[in-house]
């Protein structure tokens, strides 16, 4: 809300995952939304997905930003996104008391693979599902890729990010990412997803975005590569 407080054409409503009361949760009110964003802890909103779909406007979209259960960083030694523990998500949360440390901050929140996210959304009635890949992850991204604009060799070098927990460094993620890209597996092993679900229009859409979030706000620049329905591409820059 603070970030967009000067935007006259935008109203931001925040719904915590714990709010399931119809009298306070805006998702139960008789209103249509142009965009609904689930930023983390997607698993806690699964029972609300059908309700969200019903409350989207005709061209409205749902966006899901969350981690990938098969993200390369978890193979390399990062702990699980919400519950903690090494390799917990990779082993599909098969608890081992000697290695798995339950994290009460997020309760039973969990993350999914790309196919699992897409299947959950389809079962809730969503169509037009399209996956983007925030890098290094969905919490502190510097760029967002898509299947139509994938990273180049040597491009994924900013991998030492695991601020909330200790981590191991089992291999050089940059080198392994190069192999992943060469084998066409980036969509399965990206660290995080930004998933769009909803009715697609015939207008152009962004297939790649990069922004200099390491700079002071007045010097930051965002670069988007857009693609029209006829395949024509264009570049846009924002200061």
Protein language model regions, located:
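Class I SAM-dependent methyltransferase SAM/SAH-binding core
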Residues: 1-25
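Residues lining the SAM
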Residues: 39-42
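A short glycine-rich, Lys/Arg-flanked "PGG" loop and its adjoining helix->strand segment in the class I
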Residues: 45-63
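C-terminal lobe and adjacent flexible extensions of AdoMet/dcAdoMet transferase-like proteins
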Residues: 135, 140-239
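A short acidic, Gly/Pro-enriched loop at the edge of an enzyme's catalytic core
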Residues: 25-36
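C-terminal alpha-helical "lid/dimerization" subdomain adjacent to the S-adenosyl-L-methionine
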Residues: 80-110
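Short alpha-helix
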Residues: 105-133
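Conserved class I S-adenosyl-L-methionine
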Residues: 63-89
């Amino acid at each position: 809300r603070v970030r967009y407080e000067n935007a006259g054409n935008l109203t931001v409503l925040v719904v915590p995952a714990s709010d399931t009361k119809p009298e306070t949760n805006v998702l139960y009110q008789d209103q249509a939304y142009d965009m609904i964003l689930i930023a983390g802890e997607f698993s806690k909103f699964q029972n609300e997905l059908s309700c969200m779909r019903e409350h989207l406007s005709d061209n409205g979209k749902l966006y899901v930003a969350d981690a990938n259960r098969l993200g390369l960083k978890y193979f390399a030694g990062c702990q699980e996104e919400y519950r903690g523990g090494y390799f917990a998500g990779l082993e599909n949360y098969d608890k081992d008391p000697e290695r798995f440390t339950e994290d009460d901050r997020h309760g039973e929140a969990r993350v999914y693979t790309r196919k699992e996210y897409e299947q959950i959304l389809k079962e809730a009635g969503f169509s037009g599902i399209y996956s983007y890949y925030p890098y290094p992850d969905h919490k502190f991204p510097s760029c967002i890729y898509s299947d139509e604009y994938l990273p180049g060799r040597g491009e994924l070098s900013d991998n030492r990010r695991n601020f909330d927990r200790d981590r191991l460094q089992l291999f050089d993620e940059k080198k392994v990412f190069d192999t992943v890209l060469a084998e066409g597996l980036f969509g399965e092993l990206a660290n995080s997803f930004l998933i769009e679900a909803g009715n697609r229009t015939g207008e152009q859409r962004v297939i790649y975005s990069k922004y200099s979030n390491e700079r002071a706000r007045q010097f930051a620049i965002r670069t988007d590569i857009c693609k029209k329905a006829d395949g024509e591409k264009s570049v846009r820059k924002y200061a």
